[in-house]
Amino acid sequence: MVILNDYLYSGDTVLRILHNYIKDLRKDAKKTGNEIDMIHCNFLLQIQELLEHNDFLTAQSQKMREFYKYMAKEYPFMAFTFKGRIKSLIRAEEKFNGYVVEFIYDYYEEHGKYPSIAELKKRLSCFRDLIAYRIIISVPRCHLNSEEDREEQERKYLYQIANVLPGFLEEQGFSAEPAMGIKESTSPLLNESVKPYYRDYICSHSSNNYQSLHITFYDNSSRCYMEVQLRTKMMDDIAEIGSANHIGYEKEQEHERGRRDAIPEGECLYFDEAYERGMKLLNLKLAELDVNMFAAANNSLINDGCGLYRGCLLYTSPS
């Protein structure tokens, strides 16, 4: 079986690692007739294309800057920041294998049998966050009657911005993608006309208190998808350094993906391979990796200059 981990100790660049991994994975998939590995190759190829041919991202980021200018004009009293990134190779690989494991497990639990290749392929066609932008807002204390008003006021402004964003970006050449009822908003602050497009993690609280608004757009000029996340500073703190941060998220995902006991080993090749790849990634010791422009003292102290673990920064605005 071809595994990403085996390519992370050669001193190569991320692009070289991707190229070699895709080449070997495709060769093995053709040899074994593994259709899911072929989908896996095409998924990885999207990341490779983004890293190699990213001129369009300059124009895309400029269009996001136009919304930044709009917000600066409409909300001159508010502090806010925009961030953009291409999903990191390790996060993307974790997500792909995690989707395979979770879908097969949940399907088996519900139906007592394994999903068909067609059903699994359909589940693996929904990766639309390889490019993502995040808008974070905060109302300075001097513009609040009291600190107790902060959460209510910032949430009100966040939904106001969410109401405007789809129409604004459509004028810039983007099309909002329906959320298909996933995390459908129940907030009276969100207009009915835009509710079908948002996944509202504010109304539907999770166990780790993660809160955010997510919306997916199709960029008609570059013909690719991108995700936009909207948060208040308080929500972003919870996501980045609080109970919903990536460490807590990874532990939760490890639990979800580690449900090996329900699927007998050897019965479902696609589950077995995705499970093994996922667990090997979760157990990576980053300090031992040898990747060009990447270094880590441990799994918390990381200097990622290549996008291997934390992704490639596209755009950051001043606050």
Language-model regions: role of each:
Residues 1-317:
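Nucleic-acid processing machinery
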